[in-house]
Structure formats: C-alpha cells, structure tokens
Amino acid sequence: MISIDKRIFTHFDFVQVVLVVPICAISLVLVWEANTFLGEKQLIYTIVGFLAWLLFFLLPIRKLAWLIPFLYWINIALLLSVDIFGVERLGAKRWLEIPFTHFTLQPSEIFKPSFILMLAYLIYRKPPPKNGYKLKDFCKLSFYILLPFFLIASEPDLGSATVLFIVGFGTLFIIGVNYKIWLSIFLVVAISSPLVYANLLKPYQKQRIHDFLSEKPSYQVQQSIIAIGNGGLRGKAHEEATQTHFKFLPISTSDFIFAYTIERFGFMGGALVLFLYMLLIFHLLSLNRKLRGDYFARVAVNAVGLFIFIYAAVNVSMN
C-alpha cells in the first residue's frame, strides 16, 4: 500500500503557493472577462492543474519512479497519434478530440510533465560526474529531448517544440555537461543557422521571425501598444477597456493577454504581474543551492522554472 511521506509537510515550500495563486487568479479573471466560454475552460484547467499538483505533492514519486518511462512513452504514442487522429485547425494538426465532449486535448501540452519527470529520472539514476556529462551520456539524454522535439515540430508546432528543446538542453546546461560539448554545439548551430532558415523553415515561420525583428510593428502589435497606452497608470474598468471590449486587440486571451492585463490594471498591474513571475522564476532556480545532491528535485525545479521563464518572456515580448 502506498503511504504518504509526512516529511513533505514539514518541508513544504509556501513561497511557491504565495506566488502562484495570485498569478492564477489574475489569469482566470482576465480570460473570463475577455471570453466567458474560454474563462469556463480556464477554470476547469485551473482545477485540473490543482488536482494534478495535489497528486504529485502527496504521492511518493521516487517510489513510483519505475512508472516514469511508461508515462513518457505513452505520451510519445499520443504525439504519434496526432498525425492519424488529430483535429486540424488553421493548417496544423495539434489536437485530439476527447470522445463525447466538446473538449480537445493537445498532447504537446500534457507531454511536458512526463518530459520533466523523464529527464529527472534519467539524471537521478546516473548523476553527472565532476566535469559534467561526456558525449555518450549527453547523446543518450539528448535522444529523449530530440524525439518529442521532432514529433511536435512536424505537426507543425515549431513554437512548442522549440520551448521543449530550450528547456531540455537548458536543464542539462544547469545540471552539468562538459564545456567542450557546448562549444562544439555552439559552432555547429552558428554555421548551420542560415541554412536552416533558408531551406527548412516554412514561409509563415520566416514571417514571424521577420515581424518580431522588424522595426515597423504589425497590425496586431500596434493594437496591443494602443491597449497598453489606454491602460495608463491604474488601468480601466472592464467596460472601458475598449481595445479588448470592441475586439480590436487580437487573441486577447492568450497571445496578447499581457496587453489586456495593462489595459485593465494599468502600468502598476502589469509591473506587479512581471514582479510575481520574476520572483517565482528566481525562487525556483535558487533552489539549486538548497537541493545540491538531489538531482531528481533539481531537474524538476529547473525545468519548471525555465518553462515559466520562456512562456512569460515570449508572451510579454509579443506585446
């Protein structure tokens, strides 16, 4: 019978809860205001996320570590099934429809916990030596990062695949890989980047890069700038947030939600959200010193911290 380790209550990290709860609450309020249907879905996802957190918190994950490879390969199978059973939207197959419901499942999203756990499992079983992982171990770990990367990129969803790629290798960088390997990778990437851009990227992917680097903002970015300016210092009431209320601000529930955050809560509200994210990321990464030899926990907190940092940075920079 599985028993709950009572020590987890004495070592509970209250800082994470204090930082995560207001972020979730602000997100739920904003999405609900912008779109009631999506707000209801956001509430369901928040509840499911809380239950998943509670499950991971109470279960002795290390005693059940033998299940982690099984979960990883189940999720790989789901990624493979997208090509056969996937629902196509806007020219991409990224979702699986849940039978008898109106909900869809995005395997690339639910893959993330098993991805983190698999890296933690592998590194916990064979920690890095003093000078970092050598080429053989690095290649083995890279396989578990590159396999889902290529599957997700082929959907096509290069954005999610790239995030997974950065988190995976970013975690290895923090945990420890021999510096000669990183120098070699840097040279290969620097030389091959122009060829990849010219021959492998699709036109819309090139356009996104061009729009991001362009001095002249796109229509969507112009509308987000107007929304940010409309918010002022303290923000506007919901009915006075005209950019979102009259649908000028595109995709205000996801891509441009930070612009809506400032339109509603002003510069002060936007600064508060950024401050909460900054504290959460620094707190997670600072746990490296406290955990030290506990590689399972170190991999988990580093990967989660990197995920949060990348998504927060991308969403803010788009605005």
Predicted feature residues:
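Hydrophobic alpha-helical transmembrane segments
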Residues: 44-48, 264-284
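Helix-loop-helix junctions and helix-breaking kinks within/between transmembrane helices
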Residues: 34-40, 139-171, 201-202, 262-270
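Loop-to-helix entry and N-terminal half of a specific, functionally important transmembrane alpha helix
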Residues: 289-319
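Membrane-helix boundary/helix-loop-helix interface segments in multi-pass membrane proteins
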Residues: 2-11, 15-16, 22-155, 318
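Hydrophobic transmembrane alpha-helices of multi-pass, membrane-embedded glycosylation machinery
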Residues: 50, 161-172, 188-190, 209, ...
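Hydrophobic alpha-helical membrane-interfacial segments at the cytosolic entry of transmembrane helices
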Residues: 76, 141-143, 147, 179-196
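Transmembrane alpha-helix boundary/anchor motif
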Residues: 51, 59, 118, 200, ...
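Hydrophobic, glycine- and aromatic-enriched re-entrant/interface helices and adjoining loop segments
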Residues: 89, 93-95, 183-272, 293-296, ...
